[in-house]
């Protein structure tokens, strides 16, 4: 894997900020797009855009079919058992909130423990904090080594 080759596919990374190459680490809510995605979205918006799953006209049917084909591609890529396991959200922030407010509200009980790392993005801390407050759960923090990896032995000690 050649990181420079990968970065070259993202137009934003040719930009300099204060004379330095851009390093973008805030991808929880939105992420930078490679040119192939920008081009495909542009083509979709110009030639195919329609509601998904809401109409029977040809543009809507085509958009719905592509949407469902994408769901199947992702299912296959991550080796999910069923395509219905693939749920699209706007971003990771929304996805984390969805898990915390659905699964969490229904299944977490007083005294249950939620383990997250010390390096979590704010968007992966806040939903669990609210769950801790509403359900009286306990948040534990898995320690990280100097390379940013979870210290597995310490992590295992947190599981009770």
Give the predicted meaning of each segment.
Residues 1-160:
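Pyridoxal 5′-phosphate
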């Amino acid at each position: 894997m050649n990181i420079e080759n990968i970065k070259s596919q993202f137009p934003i990374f040719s930009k300099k900020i204060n004379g330095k190459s851009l390093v973008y680490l805030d991808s929880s809510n939105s992420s930078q797009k490679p040119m192939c995605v920008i081009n495909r979205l542009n083509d979709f918006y110009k030639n195919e855009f329609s509601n998904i799953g809401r109409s029977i006209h040809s543009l809507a049917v085509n958009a719905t079919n592509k949407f469902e084909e994408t769901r199947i591609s992702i299912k296959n890529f991550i080796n999910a058992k069923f395509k219905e396991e693939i749920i699209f959200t706007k971003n990771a922030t929304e996805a984390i909130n969805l898990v915390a407010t659905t699964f969490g509200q229904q299944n977490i009980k007083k005294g249950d423990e939620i383990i997250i790392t010390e390096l979590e993005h704010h968007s992966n801390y806040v939903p669990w904090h609210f769950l801790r407050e509403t359900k009286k759960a306990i948040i534990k923090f898995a320690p990280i080594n100097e390379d940013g990896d979870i210290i597995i032995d310490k992590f295992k000690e947190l599981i009770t």
